[in-house]
Amino acid sequence: MAKIALKDVRKVYGGNVEAIKSVSMEIADGEMIVLVGPSGCGKSTLLRMIAGLEGISGGQIMIGDRVVNDLEPSDRDIAMVFQNYALYPHMTVRQNLAYGLKNRNTPKEEIERRITEAAKALEIEQFLERKPRQLSGGQRQRVAMGRAIVRKPAAFLFDEPLSNLDAKLRVQMRVEIRRLQRSLATTSVYVTHDQMEAMTLADRLVVLNAGRIEQMGTPIELYEKPATTFVATFIGSPSMNLLAHGAASSNVSAGWSVNAAAALPPTVATLGIRPEDITLAEAEPADAAFAGTVQVDAVELVGAESYVHGSFPDGTTIVFRVPGRSQLRIGEMLKIAAQAKDFHLFDAAGKRI
């Protein structure tokens, strides 16, 4: 186990394409960090740089008390888990688990002990004599994780390991990964584009945007206090509603308004409201900080609740949550409201106020 530290790490391609822009972070010993962001944000590149699969153009990477900039991946004391499993098809599960240890001349008794421990933790004991083709996708991913676990590395690096699994199995596997990581207390860096996966797994999240860290913090910190409009719309599903706060916000014809009593700062350019913080109203309540009349465009039933997609007369769209199985009709007009305590305020640059 070891901490990981990045200081002003950069990656430049072709002399002028900067993929990673002076990224600095410290990952504590035993911490689970999740790198999340849209395609092309640099999360996989950053993981590969930590692993040594991608060279760095500047800065410093430390694993434990060693600077690893110039070390080969095999010398960094890390273990990686990929989305494509990377198992040897002609070997049994037991042989796959043992392969890396044999190459390191680990004693036979120690190999067997580690395989037994990992197989028990991953519940794959009954599959040890099978070959990968005889396993399901979830079982193969457990074996891939087992191969990383038996190495007892200083850190685990996960590169979108659940991407090939169906939705139900992804939920099951991410819970298992979190349970295992906590029990092993091994420093871990996990890459995903799935913000729900990120929220479930992370001790802290790192949201990346165009090669930069947009915000780093616990899942609840990023959800409740997004630093920018980018984070506000990326973390949370459905996304936070962002409304342009200007002349239209006091224009009755827009179909929505902000009560003057809310006393928003003059620097507010964008008003953010989470879907769950918007309520239906019989009439526009006098004490509501935000109120409006919206047309129902679509209703998304997700089980115990529904999400209503609507639009105001000025064309502004909004999403809000209603409990239960909604009987709302497409085209129906509804009155909605929200309180000032639930507002997220951003300036013209998209920064939180």
Swiss-Prot record:
Question: Which lineage is the organism of this entry classified under, starting from the top rank?
Answer: Bacteria, Pseudomonadati, Pseudomonadota, Alphaproteobacteria, Hyphomicrobiales
EC numbers for this chain: 7.6.2.10
Q: Which family does it belong to?
A: Belongs to the ABC transporter superfamily. sn-glycerol-3-phosphate importer (TC 3.A.1.1.3) family.
Q: Name one GO cellular component term.
A: ATP-binding cassette (ABC) transporter complex, substrate-binding subunit-containing
SMART domains documented for this protein:
AAA
Instruction: Reply yes or no: does the keyword Nucleotide-binding apply.
Output: yes
**Function summary:** Part of the ABC transporter complex UgpBAEC involved in sn-glycerol-3-phosphate (G3P) import. Responsible for energy coupling to the transport system.
UniProt-recorded Gene Ontology molecular function terms: ABC-type glycerol-3-phosphate transporter activity; ATP binding; ATP hydrolysis activity
Subunit and interaction comment: The complex is composed of two ATP-binding proteins (UgpC), two transmembrane proteins (UgpA and UgpE) and a solute-binding protein (UgpB).
Q: Which reaction does it catalyse?
A: sn-glycerol 3-phosphate(out) + ATP + H2O = sn-glycerol 3-phosphate(in) + ADP + phosphate + H(+)
| Domain ABC transporter, first and last residues per copy | 4-235
The residues that hold ATP are: G37, P38, S39, G40, C41, G42, K43, S44
- A GO term (biological process) for this protein? glycerophosphodiester transmembrane transport
Q: Where in the cell is it found?
A: Cell inner membrane
Could you identify this protein by its name?
Answer: sn-glycerol-3-phosphate import ATP-binding protein UgpC 3
Annotated signal sequence range: none
Entry membrane topology: Peripheral membrane protein
Q: What class of enzyme is it?
A: translocase
Instruction: Tell me the organism.
Output: Agrobacterium fabrum (strain C58 / ATCC 33970) (Agrobacterium tumefaciens (strain C58))
Keywords, A to Z, come to: ATP-binding, Cell inner membrane, Cell membrane, Membrane, Nucleotide-binding, Sugar transport, Translocase, Transport
